[in-house]
């Protein structure tokens, strides 16, 4: 919604529901250094510009709701507060230890688990496969406001 200045997960999903979005092969995500290119109106792949919409968009505000939604429909869109120490993550269950807040960051929850009595989320990041654990990380349940405002919906194909 606001480019490099952040956005709102629910508004993003409501746009997806009302206006639709194109496929990743049509308009692939490109990581950058904060420069936002003009929006395209044609697919880079040469395929037809077809928009897909979503239904049943809803917010989830606790771990039980998120786990149920994962089992019912797949990945969940969420965000959390990123701190300095998260930038050094390379594996294991992340727990905030120290550092300043760097702002919010949107990610996708793909699963959960428990290790030595600690509940955690398995998460796909958008920083590429060289970061974290092949582009994924594990974060302690409840850490950094992680599971208090997630959004899900069902794609219409």
Where are each of the predicted segments found?
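Catalytic-core signature of thiol
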Residues: 1-157
């Amino acid at each position: 919604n606001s480019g490099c200045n952040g956005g709102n997960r629910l508004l993003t999903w409501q746009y997806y529901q009302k206006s639709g979005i194109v496929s990743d092969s049509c308009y692939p995500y490109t990581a950058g250094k904060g420069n936002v290119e003009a929006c395209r109106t044609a697919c880079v792949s040469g395929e037809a510009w077809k928009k897909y919409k979503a239904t049943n968009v809803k917010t989830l505000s606790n771990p039980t709701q998120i786990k149920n939604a994962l089992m019912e429909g797949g990945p969940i869109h969420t965000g959390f507060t990123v701190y300095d120490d998260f930038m050094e993550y390379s594996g294991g269950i992340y727990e905030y230890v120290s550092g300043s807040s760097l702002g919010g960051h949107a990610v996708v929850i793909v699963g959960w688990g428990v290790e030595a009595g600690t509940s955690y989320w398995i998460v796909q990041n958008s920083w590429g496969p060289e970061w974290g654990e092949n582009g994924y990380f594990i974060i302690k349940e409840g850490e950094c406001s992680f599971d208090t405002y997630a959004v899900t919906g069902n794609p219409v194909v």
